[in-house]
């Protein structure tokens, strides 16, 4: 189930719902294969929020901004001779009772080291991601995405975690489940 770009903590239960789908999404992004990534989503307005400097929250709320951020930040680092991978440290997935909606929460750490194997502390960060999935054409497709980045960008930075997950979940329940 692991790939070149995605590693699982030994504590992860590999039979958790949607783990395979989450790994596919991560793997396609880590490989910069955005067409493959887009084939597994029905979400052009995913949100990433993080607070790396001076309390200012940056929000990316569309796929193009997100791809630009990822390409600029991670792709440039891997092109400069660093080995890049994501470790999934914690995972939880659940399906709705009628099996039409599911969500997963992933806590991961991005790692970068020199390709020679020297541990080079350039960019590690923790990221909590919540994906909401629904069934489309008999397979799970990512429907809504939210990530909050926290952690260490190679220099001591204080992050303020401002998650919008409860708000997103409330909207989803109203729109998708009619509650």
Indicate where each model-derived feature is located.
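Short, low-complexity N-terminal intrinsically disordered segments enriched in polar/charged residues
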Residues: 1-53, 178
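Short structured motifs
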Residues: 22, 85-93, 113-114, 126
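A solvent-exposed, acidic/Ser-Thr-rich amphipathic alpha-helical stretch
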Residues: 34-101, 105
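Short consensus segments that form the blades of beta-propeller domains
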Residues: 81, 118-122
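Generic short beta-strand segments
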Residues: 105-113
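A short, acidic/glycine-rich surface segment
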Residues: 112-117, 152-154
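Low-complexity, charge- and small-residue-enriched intrinsically disordered regions
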Residues: 170-179
